[in-house]
């Protein structure tokens, strides 16, 4: 144990007390480890991926919160990516370790991961909280850029993470764009399937208004009355989040034209616009639920 006491190993989150008697066991046994560093290049925790495809435990686990590790204040790979983020002017934000590693190996250096898996119980690996972008992580990114590009998984959980990421980025007065993956279930797979296309999709990331319109009109039949109602409901909610009144006005007019409905009706149905935001980045504004 390299001279550390059992209590210190447990407090550091790398070991757990045995339930079968005295002693401890390795929290990350039989797992591939991903060291997690803070922005000052100090190792503060680990992520672990199971090596057994038939394992009943969770595929990924993270270190628990400790005296030196709080997942809300750490972004995986930010210690290496921060200079590239400054140079490019934006950060690509993904969900997991492998998303970062595959992208980094492919030459995409301004990339970080939220890596938000957390154990509900120290001993029950099958119970997990969902991954998600945290407001503190957004504040951390704002030190290095004024724009983020969200590139989360293509499943429902990834879509939910994108929606929350949009709200948090707007709350922090950051520009936010969405990378719409046309291949692969996640950035890791997309980078390995067709790197050129993946890089193009990052470069051509869509502003949130454009992304919302593209997504809705792809899924909803707006030729029907019910389809028009569904599209209007979703897109008006998205438009209401836009902080710029000129941008909101532009998209309301566009929606009226695309749905062939009266602009006045849409304006009457528009949720209340966001309240003026404070310039103090440390204060959470009304966009954060």
Regions of interest found by a model, annotated:
Residues 1-145, 161-162:
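Phosphate-handling DNA/RNA-contact segment within nucleic-acid enzymes
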Residues 38-39, 82-89, 105, 127-289:
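A charged alpha-helical hairpin associated with nucleic-acid processing machineries
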């Amino acid at each position: 144990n390299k001279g550390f006491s059992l209590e210190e190993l447990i407090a550091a989150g790398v070991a757990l007390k045995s339930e079968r008697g005295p002693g401890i066991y390795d929290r990350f046994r039989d797992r591939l480890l991903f060291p997690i560093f803070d922005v000052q290049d100090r190792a503060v925790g680990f992520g672990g991926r199971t090596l057994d495809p038939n394992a009943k435990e969770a595929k990924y686990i993270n270190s628990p919160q400790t005296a030196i590790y709080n997942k809300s204040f750490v972004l995986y790979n930010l210690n290496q990516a921060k200079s590239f983020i400054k140079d490019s002017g934006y950060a690509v934000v993904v969900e997991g370790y492998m998303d970062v590693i595959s992208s980094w190996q492919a030459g995409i250096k301004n990339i970080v991961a939220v890596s938000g898996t957390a154990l509900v119980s120290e001993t029950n690996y099958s119970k997990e909280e969902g991954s998600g972008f945290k407001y503190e992580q957004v504040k951390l990114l704002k030190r290095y850029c004024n724009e983020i590009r969200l590139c989360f998984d293509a499943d429902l959980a990834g879509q939910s993470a994108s929606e929350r990421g949009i709200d948090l980025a707007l709350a922090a007065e950051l520009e936010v764009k969405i990378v719409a993956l046309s291949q692969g279930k996640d950035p890791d797979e997309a980078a390995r399937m067709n790197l050129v296309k993946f890089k193009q999709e990052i470069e051509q990331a869509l502003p949130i208004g454009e992304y919302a319109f593209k997504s809705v009109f792809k899924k909803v039949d707006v030729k029907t009355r019910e389809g028009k109602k569904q599209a209007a409901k979703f897109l008006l909610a998205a438009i209401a989040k836009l902080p710029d009144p000129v941008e909101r006005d532009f998209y309301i007019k566009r929606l009226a034209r695309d749905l062939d409905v009266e602009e006045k009706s849409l304006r009457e149905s528009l949720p209340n616009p966001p309240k003026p935001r404070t310039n103090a980045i440390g204060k959470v504004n009304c966009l954060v639920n």
